[in-house]
Amino acid sequence: MKALIAFLVCGLATWGYAQTPLKTFTSSDGLFRFSYSDVLIDCLPQPTAADSATPATSKTSTDHPSALSIPAACASQGATCDGPGSEGASVACFAYPKERFKDKPSFVAATFYVSEIESAKNKKICMDGSPDWFVINSKGVTTINHVTFKIFEIGDNWMNGGQSGPAYRTFHNGKCYELGIQTVSSRAEYDPGTVKEFSKEDWSEVEGRLRNALNSFVFLK
């Protein structure tokens, strides 16, 4: 009976995950697209038609996201919409909603991002990685939708916290692109029993959402 109950619970969880609505992100220049769960939060919302119609002379600094308007899920001491040390220009960035784990303070942020590494002018520089990286591991190469990427595990550390995750580099049509997942954690200490633990199941949920976006990435031209 216990085995049957466990099977049914797992089956329902898998069904629920699969049934989560997906959205499609297409870059403003039509270069790439990917699908992402509508659970994720857009850290870099695209300009709307109304924004585009507003005369440039009437725009003020309030028309652009400020530090105060950044969603909580996208905010961290470290870089979340680019690899730490990558110095890239973020093109897309989606975060897992922080409020889902508000009672688990060790979870700070988790994002999937796409950035252009403008300083990498050729394939060798691009695929060698950024000189300012703290490289945890270099994992070789992989293929995502017929495009080859070199994989690095990169991160950063500070007092009572840190971040890490994979960075995927490719040189496409004369430009260097980096896809990545970064997870930020707090190592602050709490009295036993005062907070809940961020579990393996929690991490599986977060990583699954972000990797779905990563694995659906495709260049359109």
Indicate where each model-derived feature is located.
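Sec-dependent N-terminal signal peptides
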Residues: 3-12
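Preference for short coil/turn "hinge" residues that link or interrupt alpha-helices
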Residues: 5, 25-29, 137-140, 196
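Boundary at the C-terminal end of the N-terminal hydrophobic targeting segment
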Residues: 16-18
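Short structural boundary motif marking the start of a folded domain
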Residues: 21-23
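Secretory pathway targeting signatures of secreted, lumenal, and periplasmic proteins
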Residues: 26-128, 159-169
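Short, well-structured beta-strand
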Residues: 103-111, 115, 124-221
